[in-house]
C-alpha cells in the first residue's frame, strides 16, 4: 500500500471515529499541513511524519482497548462459534444464515459488550493430576482479560459426535460432569473438585454441548482466586467402557482424525463480559438503506459516504471481520435561515441568526446527530479471539449544531 494513502486513512479514521470527542483536537494545524505536504509530495515521509502516524495509530488502538498493535501468529485458529456469533450479531440477511445451527445467546449477550474465546493449554495436559479415573483437567489462561472487564457469564463448549454402531438405545446414555478444580493434587494423589454443571446425553446426536462455568470464572477473575482449571468427567450410565467418552472431543488423543479437525472440535471456553463502556451486544436487525433524493450540487449539511477499509491501514491481518464498514461523515453548509430538514437545535438557530448580522460569530457546524455501533471480530495482543461492540462508529444522521 502507498505510504501516503496509509497515513491519509489513519487520519480519516481518527477524524471519523474520534470526531465529536476530545481526541479530535489531537491533530494540530501544523501536523495537518505537514501530513498533507508529505502526501502531495509523493508519499515520502519525514521522521516527524512517521512519528505522527505512530501516535495516531496508538490513539486508535487505545480507542479499541488495545495496548499495542496485535501481531497474530499464523497458527491462530478462529473458532467457528465466534464467526457464527459475529454473523448473527451483525444482522446479516436471514438467507445468508441458513448454515448456522446455533441460536443467538440472548441472555448472556444482554449483559455483555465483549465475548472472548479460549482454548486450554495443551502443554499442561501431561502434568500430574491432569487425568485420573477418566477425569480430564483443562487449564485456561485468562490473563488477557482486562481488569476493567466484569465477567457476567461463561460457558464451556464440548463437541460430541454420534456413534453409528454403538450400544442399544437404552445403553447409550452418558453423563458429562464439569468441575472446578479446587486442588490439583492432594496428599492421597487425587484432585479435589467442585461440581459446576452436569448433563445426561445420548450418543445418537452430533452437536455442541454448552455447560455453565460462570461461578469458577468469576472467582478467578473477580475474586482473584487461584485458577487450577476445570475437570471434565464422562460416565457411561451402564458402566460400559467400550464407548465411554470416545465420542466427546475432550482430548486430541481421542480424535483419530487430522489436527485440522481437532482445532475446530477441541473444548472451547467462552466468556461474556462488559467493560463499562457502551451498550450490550443486543442483536441488531438489518437496516433498510436510506432512500435519499438525488441532489443537484446540494451544499447543505448532509450525510456523505465514507467506506473505511481496514486493509488500507494494514489492520486486515488481525481484524477478522468485517473487512471494512461504511462509516459515513457529515459535511455541508448551515445557511440562514436554517431549514427544518437540517435537524438544528434552538442554539444553532440563534447562532446562525447572530452570524447573519455579525460575521465574527461562526456559523453552526454540520455534525453527526445520531450514531450507531458496529461489532468487530479480531485477534488481540495475546492471539485470543474477541468479539466486541464499539459504540458511535457509524453516522446515521447529520444536523446543524
UniProtKB/Swiss-Prot annotation:
GO terms for cellular component: extracellular space. Glycans are attached at residues 141, 204, 238, 343, 358. Disulfide bonds join 301-366, 330-398, 334-400. It is found in: Secreted, Extracellular space, Extracellular matrix. Its main location: secreted. Residues 280-299 have a biased composition (Basic residues). Pfam families: TGF_beta (PF00019), TGFb_propeptide (PF00688). Keywords: Chondrogenesis, Cleavage on pair of basic residues, Cytokine, Developmental protein, Differentiation, Disulfide bond, Extracellular matrix, Glycoprotein, Growth factor, Osteogenesis, Secreted, Signal. Residues 279-299 are annotated as: Disordered. Residues 1-19 form the signal peptide. Residues 20-287 form a propeptide. InterPro entries: BMP4_TGF_beta-like, Cystine-knot_cytokine, TGF-b_C, TGF-b_propeptide, TGF-beta-rel, TGFb_CS. It comes from the Eukaryota. Homodimer; disulfide-linked. Forms heterodimers with the TGF-beta family member derriere. Part of a complex consisting of twsg1 and chrd. Interacts with tsku. Belongs to the TGF-beta family. Posterior-ventralizing factor in Xenopus mesoderm induction. Induces posteroventral mesoderm and counteracts dorsalizing signals such as activin. This is Bone morphogenetic protein 4. It comes from Xenopus laevis (African clawed frog). The gene is bmp4.
